Design a protein with these regions (language model features):
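Catalytic binding pocket for nucleotide-activated donors in carbohydrate/polymer assembly enzymes
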Residues: 19-20, 31, 35-43, 48, ...
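Active-site donor-binding loop signature of nucleotide-sugar glycosyltransferases
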Residues: 7, 50, 81, 263-264
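Donor nucleotide-sugar binding/catalytic pocket of nucleotide-sugar-dependent glycosyltransferases
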Residues: 25-34, 42-57, 73-84
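Redox-cofactor binding/interface segments in oxidoreductases and associated redox assembly factors
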Residues: 4, 28, 217
């Protein structure tokens, strides 16, 4: 048997005939994506939310030195990428002007919509036909992905994440001190955000979460309903979390008690 547990959604490599091999047992954390694969009649696909080793984190944090706590203390912190290099920006100049405006408007509209993804509806057959002239879409002969799936997630999804994260960080920095831990700073578009560089996932990141008054999570819109790993990372370190709304939160958390989630940018502020 081969057992896998996804941490990204959707995993585009799963859209391949090999997922039907009887030796594959696949666990998916995003229930929306799990239901999609279940509808494809996969025998060994299961829904399993992500998790964190809280005992490891407890031991790590118990041994954190005072100077480390001071080093990683923040009013508001965000640990994550800004997707400053993404596939959408790579093709932007090759898009017709009206398509640029079309997608720019879609990004602005999606910014304040949570729990729904409008990209599914805006990629009409005519738009997809136009995009096929601009995007070098190639795939393995055993793959069953299509240009809509690829463009929604690889192009629009990561560009949306960039747009949203920069917008949110700049809004927060108007009212409070914001520390950003990233190797992907997009310095020219950030305003009054303090860039702190990278932190190691296993050793230093939990210390940031424990020492921050508010930890931010911005779920990439490709994850339709599931709870991203970053949420579990913060909670496992005992950190306070402010996050965008995800439908599956309602099955695990109480808003205002376990976590605090927002459903609009004004609500976040």
């Amino acid at each position: 048997k081969y057992i896998s547990w996804t941490v990204d959604s959707p995993m585009l490599t799963m859209y391949h005939d090999s997922v039907y091999n009887p030796c594959n047992y696949i666990f998916i954390f995003d229930k929306f994506n799990y239901m999609q694969f279940k509808a494809m009649e996969l025998n060994h696909v299961y829904y399993l939310p992500l998790a964190v080793d809280s005992e490891r984190l407890e031991h790590l944090l118990e041994n954190t030195k005072p100077d480390e706590k001071e080093k990683f203390s923040s009013d508001i912190s965000f640990v994550g990428g800004l997707y400053d290099k993404n596939s959408y920006d790579d093709i932007y100049e090759s898009l017709p002007p009206y398509l640029r405006g079309y997608f720019d408007s879609a990004f602005r509209a999606q910014l304040d919509i949570f729990g729904d993804n409008i990209f599914d509806r805006i990629l009409t057959p005519d738009i997809l036909a136009e995009l096929s002239e601009c995007v070098d879409f190639r795939q393995d002969e055993n793959s069953f992905s299509d240009i809509k799936l690829i463009f929604t997630n690889t192009f629009l999804g990561y560009k949306m994440a960039q747009t949203e994260r920069i917008e949110c960080l700049n809004l927060l920095a108007k009212a409070a001190k914001v520390d950003l831990y990233t190797d992907d700073p997009a310095k020219d578009r950030l305003r009054n955000v303090i860039i702190r560089g990278t932190v190691s996932y296993f050793n230093d990141m939990p210390k940031v979460f424990a020492a921050s008054k508010i930890n931010m999570n911005f779920t990439i819109r490709n994850i339709r309903s599931g709870i991203p790993l970053r949420v579990w990372d913060v909670l496992g370190a005992g950190g306070f979390l402010l996050t965008n709304f995800q439908p599956e939160f309602l099955s695990f958390f109480e808003n205002g008690k376990d976590i605090v989630f927002y459903d609009s940018l004004s609500d976040m502020q």
